[in-house]
Every structure is written in structure tokens, then in C-alpha cells.
Amino acid sequence: MRALTLLALLALAALCIAGQAGAKPSGAESSKGAAFVSKQEGSEVVKRPRRYLYQWLGAPVPYPDPLEPRREVCELNPDCDELADHIGFQEAYRRFYGPV
């Protein structure tokens, strides 16, 4: 009984494999490589929301923080960085380096 079941499964597998080998690709698959798509088709599949748009496209680009260079200077000094955690960046920077 097991041998008959195994033989039937093998025959079914052979028919499936033979059917796939003889099949021809459709017109869309034969004209293009199956592994590659155009840039336009790829961008239609993966549409990411844009964070920053240019002004002429609708939304303005966010302005950079003018205090960011000073904040980085304060972060590089361990004492200023520690004090900034307690009393705030602007006050810590003022105490170490003068007016902001």
C-alpha cells in the first residue's frame, strides 16, 4: 500500500515538473527579464513619503537650527554637556563660552 502511494506521488510530481518545463512564458515575461524592472515600475511599487519638499513643489524646506553648531561644541565638552542636562543648553553654553 505504501509503495503504491509513493509511486502515485512520484508520478504526479513528474507530471507537474514536465508541465512546467514545457510551458512558454507569457508576452510580458518574454519581452523583459523576469528579475529586472524599470525604474518607473519600481518607483510605483515602492512609494515612500518624502520628508522635505522643495519650496516650488508645495511645502517649504525646514530651516536648519542656528544653535546647532554651538550645541555640538557644548556636547564635545563633557562638563558643558553635563551642565546642559541639568540647566539647559543655552545657559550651560553661556556659562562656559559667553553669550549665545
From Swiss-Prot:
Cite a single GO BP annotation.
regulation of bone resorption
Looking at the record, the residues that make up the Gla domain are: 52-98
4-carboxyglutamate: residues bearing it: E68, E72, E75
Task: Summarize where Ca(2+) 1 binds, as residue positions.
Answer: E68
Site for Not hydroxylated, residues: P60
Which residues are noted in the entry as Ca(2+) 2-binding? E72, E75
Propiece residues:
24-51
Which region is the signal sequence? 1-23
State where the protein is found: Secreted
Q: What SMART domains does the database record attribute to this sequence?
A: GLA
Cite the binding residues for Ca(2+) 3: E75, D81
- Secreted as a keyword? yes
What is stated as this protein's family in its record? Belongs to the osteocalcin/matrix Gla protein family.
State what protein this is by name. Answer: Osteocalcin
Gene name as annotated? BGLAP
